[in-house]
Amino acid sequence: MTVNSQRHSVLLDNVYSLIDKKVDAQQKSLVQQFGRLLYKNISNDDLENRNDSDLYGATLSLWSGLAKFKSTAPYIRVFNPEIEKHGWHSSHTIVEIIVNDMPFLVDSVRMSLNRLNITAHLFLHSPIAIKRNDKAQVTAFAEPGKTLEGTRKETVIFIEVDRQTSKSDIETLTKELHSVVDEVSLAVADWQDMTGKLQTVIKDTAKFNWPVSAAHKKQTKTFLEWLSDHNFTMMGYRYYEVKAIEGDHRWIPANDTSLGLLKNSINDRERLLSKLPASAREEALSDHPLILTKTNSRSRVHRPAYMDYVGVKVFNKDGNVVGEHRFLGLYSASFYNMSVTQLPILKEKVQEICALSGFEPGTHAFKAFENIVETYPRDELLQTPADELAQIVMGIFQMQERGISRLFIRKDVFGRFFSCMVFVPRERYNTQLRKETQALLKASLGAKEEVEFTTFFSESVYARTHYIARVKDNNAEYDVKEIEKNIIE
């Protein structure tokens, strides 16, 4: 044991001694056990420059919160501890959260701090098996790795964040945390119902009258089955009825079917298809059984990506769209890590665009073309029509290793963004060029916010950066060659 480790061990022992001296005899053993569970994973670095009295105060403060916690509502407290008022001090603002244990909680809380540009200087969290009596008082803790009859897991979170000096800042953070915990609770509470709904949809596909070939129906059903096999994190579900009216269509939400996060928009109103761009109207009423796209908003649960939207269309016997089962969530890591040749729907699309290339299978050209597809952004592979994707991939292939710069732009069919793929020689790529390209795309395409980017390096001589320019309407006119010229210059 190092000198620092010994000192930190003594520091925590002093905390437990203070509990022994100051806490009521009937509770002190429980409070000591709670402290050991709370600090069992704290690092030596996190204990540096701390004193036993403040750690004791933090422990007692959380213990008090644990006593107040009722399983029906989360306990969330944000405050600046003061010696005179709380008996202990911290130079940071303290966040205490106690909730029933659930998935995604810690990631979602971290995301909420990041959205507010608040840094966490200490983040302790632990699911603890707690036994309470009929008055909700804590009576026992199960030791890690051991079971104790009558316990329920509760997650205790203690965070030290940048000091929030104003009352409004503290209120904003508190409100944000309540909102996030509520969203996590909604998604987790309805998870089983949402996965059950997907299973029902899979069983009922024969009733949906999809006006496509038997092979296409099989591919679609296989994809939905793959999603249900833990490859899609469910966040929300709702059914929409589609009614044709004179010269238009209405998407009518069946709000009583809402599950998960879509319960937050329970009063969602019906929408006219005519309000959408022409490409979106065409997609919504097309023969394609599925709508695969992204939502307009980032997930506040699990990871901060734009949520994935899987719409399963229902047709009548005349081949007209009459309904949609809408699932919102996030594709799991397997979607991004598995080979495209193993992913339902994508593997068929890859086969189609490789066939469109005209290259003979097994040739060097075919393998090079196939490799471009394999390493292409997965979301783009899924959302881009096969014929358009084949043209883009052929354009990339034709660049070969010539050291030129190229820009490829795809319009989102729902009119919400431009997807821009920029290839530049690796030796040219740097942060300054990336920032200049972001500014150029924002101005040229009329983006309403900062252009997002993801850069990919491979063995190629090129650096590939995928930019997303979010707009109110992507029908704006633009000149790809002119933008490309400005990037080169």
Give residue spans per PLM region.
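Charge-rich interaction surfaces and accessory domains that mediate macromolecular binding and assembly
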Residues: 1-90, 94-96, 111, 126, ...
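Well-ordered mid-protein domain cores that form the structural environment of catalytic cofactors
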Residues: 102, 106-107, 111-143
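A short interface-forming secondary-structure element
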Residues: 97-99, 420-429
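Extended charged low-complexity segments that act as oligomerization/scaffolding linkers
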Residues: 131-163, 466-467
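Short connector loops at secondary-structure junctions
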Residues: 125-135, 451-464
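Short beta-strand elements
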Residues: 74, 120-126, 405, 448-456
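Short, non-transmembrane amphipathic alpha-helical segments
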Residues: 109-110, 114, 433-446, 487
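Short secondary-structure junctions
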Residues: 69-72, 116-119, 397-403, 442-449
